[in-house]
Amino acid sequence: YYAYGESSDREILNDTDYLLSLTSGVSNPPFMVIDDGWQENHRINEYNGGPWKRGNGKFPDMKALAEKMKEKGVRPGIWVRLLLNEDRKIPGEWRISHNGCLDPSHPEALRYIREDVERICSWGYQLIKHDFSTFDLFGKWGFETNFQTEASGWNFYDRGKTGAEIVKQLYEEIFRAASEYHAVIIGCNTIGHLGAGLMHLNRTGDG
């Protein structure tokens, strides 16, 4: 399911019915994934980050929506962009200086990210698709990178770790948080070899 943008809980439930009509008789319940567009501060074609504490007006109750999806017979999944977050309560030192995204090398920022994953899983979502982390960390898409991916003039909070170690630490924390709820992880715009064993699926694309 790949349908980001304008959506609503009603549209998700209608699409759930359609998905079930295509999978009638299948013993393994399909996943129905809510893509970008559900989050509180979503602004179409402008902003697709957090906070990830609640849905917007078209998604008034994310926990109830997951329950309705389960009642229909699918396994609820959801999309998140964990590092882009405009919550004004987040301290500046938790952010990467060159773009303002969360810096997972900072222990408190990493804990904040983990809490977001735990919250979403606690609502009843059994699949987490985390997206954009490579771009949000390094400011480049896959086709733009080379052997030197980092721009000059900035650094992560923890200067004692390499970029690869920081990326893997992020993947590990997401995986541990989701595993407490037996949730499946899809990586999107992730670095494949660093995510080995820490993602159940890796969406092909610009990673």
Across the structure, where does each feature detected by a protein language model lie?
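Aromatic- and carboxylate-enriched substrate-binding clefts and catalytic-loop regions
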Residues: 28-207
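An acidic-aromatic substrate-binding cleft motif
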Residues: 1-18, 22-31, 35-40
